[in-house]
């Protein structure tokens, strides 16, 4: 299972693992500022931010798994096989194929807030890159130093969620992932309080007491 995560302390970190048992010969790919991106329905963008990430490069097109642009905005696509639904081209929308979404967002946006604005009129289309490379069912996490969002294209349309957990994995949709965290709210690095039989010692307590006697 793949997982994306952001960490912000004094510095800011974003990363993901690619938990697959096979390889598409992915490699580190750097796209300079004026390298042309030819979008299926939105023309060509030759004036964009530079970006670096892991990609499967086909016919000069980096099919990014994840990337970070020169402004510090990062984005990763993770598997979303049971829930992802892409749509036909829609009028009055920016129609972007799933394999185009990372360069489309990172090429234009400096921040999560700008990405939110751009996503308001976005439609993710059913287009595959080629007959041999059909569209992958994905959802995306977008991150900067100030915040984090998740983008999911489903049967009822495009959803953009603030992601306060700063983590995203594959299925289910993000609201259910956040709900599932409630099952683990009792976990702690501290020893639990013994409310069942206070006269009994936990194993670790007994070991500590034995060491103090020695």
Residue spans of the language-model regions?
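Long, His/Glu/Asp-enriched segments that create or flank divalent metal/ion-associated functional microenvironments
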Residues: 171-194
């Amino acid at each position: 299972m793949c997982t994306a995560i952001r960490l912000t302390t004094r510095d800011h970190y974003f990363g993901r693992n690619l938990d697959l048992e096979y390889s598409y010969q992915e490699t580190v790919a750097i796209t300079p500022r004026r390298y042309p991106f030819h979008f299926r329905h939105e023309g060509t963008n030759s004036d964009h931010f530079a970006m670096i990430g892991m990609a499967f490069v086909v016919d000069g097109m980096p099919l990014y798994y994840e990337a970070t642009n020169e402004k510090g905005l990062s984005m990763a696509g993770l598997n979303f096989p049971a829930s992802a639904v892409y749509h036909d081209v829609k009028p009055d929308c920016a129609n972007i194929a799933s394999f185009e979404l990372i360069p489309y967002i990172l090429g234009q946006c400096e921040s999560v807030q700008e990405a939110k604005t751009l996503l308001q009129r976005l439609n993710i289309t059913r287009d595959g890159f080629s007959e041999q490379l059909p569209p992958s069912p994905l959802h995306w996490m977008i991150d900067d130093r100030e915040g984090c969002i998740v983008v999911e294209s489903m049967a009822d349309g495009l959803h953009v969620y603030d992601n306060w957990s700063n983590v995203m994995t594959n299925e289910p949709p993000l609201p259910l992932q956040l709900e599932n965290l409630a099952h683990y709210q009792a976990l702690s690095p501290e020893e639990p309080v013994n409310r069942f039989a206070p006269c009994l010692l936990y194993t670790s307590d007994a070991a500590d007491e034995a060491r103090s006697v020695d």
